[in-house]
Amino acid sequence: MILFNNLFLTLRATLKSLADGKIWFYLFVPTLLALFVWVLLLIFSLGALSEKLMDAPPLSLMVAWGMISLAKMLALISGWISITGLSYLIGLLVTSIFILPLLLKHIGKTQYADLVFAGNSFWGSTALYSCWVIFLYVLLWVLTLPLWFVPGFALILPLILMAWLNYKTYTFEILADFATSAEKKEILQKHFLSLFLLGLLLSLVAHLPILCLFAPGITALAFSHYVLLALKELRGDAILSVEVQNK
């Protein structure tokens, strides 16, 4: 029940934030960039990418067996998915490096004014961390490619990998700004399952047409609310504990 309550509070806070016009600016910047990249790649790269996929196994085997139409269709679908994924990664990178700090500063002042910035992060470390996590995500994606041909895995693996990407990128960067080392450790231990589930739910959004372009900004906003709500709860419990001990 606690897990679903935390997710419900996060959803409610996220929807409430959408009434703020400035929030939409933070959502649209990565969306427009991702859309621009997506359209360019679809126009100039989809054909060439599909041809290369046709020349590589297992599609090349399908062509050799005479299933040319099916191979072409699968090549186009695979190319479209790859381009959409790349556009999402670019949007996520821009969001995590440039938009998230501004978003945190804004909602920190407007909705979490009582929370103190207790972290010690700086812009350079955030940028390097985001690039490192995306590199690991791509590496995991490549290493698990053979599993995609196992029935059902092609649907499950992309969601799990993106859930991990969302969790690692946003949770750690938000905690780096607001939380002390002890607070980071406690929140990551106590809320891991909820945060991963949040990443999984938002990875579904990232795989939906059109909505996928808004996914980086929406994901950053939702994770910001979850982590800050968890931190607020943690600090409230700590204050209450001190007051009880003093009595």
Where are these regions (language model features)?
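Interfacial aromatic "cap" segments that immediately flank transmembrane helices
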Residues: 14-32, 115-142, 167-205
